[in-house]
């Protein structure tokens, strides 16, 4: 009977470790992406120039605000 208990405890610890590791890694990545967004103002400016638009600071600020708001909604 002790063997079954040991196996059960090992499996339970493994599952708890996997779930805990998943959530810790998820939180770390969310914080990392918030501090280092995948796109910044300079990248937006270059994209707009490549599309033939004149990048005004107002447009860039609007796009960054929109992207940050969208990112915050996805994180919740």
From Swiss-Prot:
Give the family this protein belongs to, as stated in its UniProt record. Belongs to the UPF0154 family.
What this protein is called in its record is UPF0154 protein Sca_0984
Q: How does it sit in the membrane?
A: Single-pass membrane protein
| Superkingdom, taxonomy of origin | Bacteria
- Keywords for the protein's UniProt record, in alphabetical order: Cell membrane, Membrane, Transmembrane, Transmembrane helix
**Localisation per UniProt entry:** Cell membrane
The UniProt entry's GO CC annotations, sorted and at most eight, read: plasma membrane
Segments traversing the membrane: 4-24
- A Pfam family of the record is UPF0154
Q: What is its main location?
A: membrane
Q: Which organism is it from?
A: Staphylococcus carnosus (strain TM300)
